[in-house]
Amino acid sequence: MATALEGGKAATPRTLVVNGERFEHIKFTNFKNLEKPLTDILRSVNPSNSAVVFDIDETILINDPKIDACYHARPNPGIMKIYRLCLRLQIAVYFVTARRLSDENYEWTTKQLQCIGAGKYAELHMCPESYRVSAAKISEFKKRARARIMRKSKRQIVLNAGDQWTDTLQMSSIKECNAFIEKDNKSYWLFQPIDREVVWQLKLPDRGGY
């Protein structure tokens, strides 16, 4: 992994081990310092065989019960910048969410994405009820969804972003999930998995999404 700037200084990648798998990672304290590395990553890939995956809640949008617009949600400005850059570069966008899969939820979610300005995407993957029993099972669903996207589309996922550790890392148990929840959840973590299918993983500050 190349070094990236954090507050004007070169940030040195560190190694994290999860389930025996090694990840190079850099922590950013704010989106401003992260924006250029993300932009450089997306501009460096071939858009014809690349894809980006976003979580929905507290990632592409922020749920806010105090507002009436867009079904009580507003766009997340930083992630929307990355979303719009993907569209300009013609990189396929996919959404993978732990929202329960149903016809009603699907219709509501598509309307909400359209309302916040994120209505252009290749596919929306929602979570079957059988996976919504634990954080570990949700992480399994999301991993399977990403694998399915790459298999069907013949595209490489170059960036996968979400606000929960289960959005980005495969967790095998609730205990392991809880251990990660206790880590620094107020920073941005940019991971480069070693020998994994997704090129970059982005963990956003935890806003209580799923």
Model regions: which residues?
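Second-shell loop/turn segments in exported
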Residues: 22-27, 65-72, 94-100, 131-136
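Asp-based phosphoryl-transfer active-site loop
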Residues: 48-66
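C-terminal cap/substrate-recognition subdomain and adjoining C-terminal extension
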Residues: 2, 8-11, 104-210
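Acidic/histidine-rich, surface-exposed loop or edge segments in extracytoplasmic proteins
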Residues: 16-22, 61-67, 89, 126
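Non-catalytic pre-domain segments flanking phosphatase-related domains
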Residues: 1-54
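A general structural motif
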Residues: 47-49, 90, 155-157
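Short, acidic loop-to-helix structural element flanking the phosphoryl-transfer center
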Residues: 67-94, 101-107
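Structured segments of extracytoplasmic/periplasmic soluble domains
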Residues: 41, 63, 82-92, 112-116, ...
